[in-house]
Amino acid sequence: MFSGGDYGEVARWLANFVTSHAKRESPRVEAIVEAEGERENQSYGVRLRLGKRVLPPPGTPPLEPDFADVSAHRGDLAWCDALARRVRELARQLIAEEREERRSA
């Protein structure tokens, strides 16, 4: 497996990873990976979007994996499995909230 990489390369890998696992729950879920501003070269902000709904919602902290941690562990299957579980749980929560919103409308 692979690890390491510069900030941009790791950001692309993380965006693909999050997208892949979120879409396993629903192809309509989109990944948002924030990699600019205060986070640049330090960490990433991860959110998921389904329609107009975003989790974690704006104004609250996103999932925030550290650049060094992602870079060092992206080749570690156990670490990737733990991150995939977090992403998929967030996607399931987003889908459930959207369904509930449609039912009550």
Residue ranges of predicted features:
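Negatively charged, low-complexity tracts enriched in Asp/Glu with abundant Ser/Thr
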Residues: 1-37, 71-85, 105
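Long beta-sheet-rich domains in secretory-pathway and surface-associated proteins
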Residues: 13, 58-60, 103
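A short, glycine/Asx- and small/polar-enriched loop/turn
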Residues: 38-46
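Intrinsically disordered, low-complexity regulatory segments enriched in Ser/Thr/Pro
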Residues: 50-85, 89
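Intrinsically disordered, low-complexity regulatory regions enriched in serine/threonine/proline
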Residues: 83-105
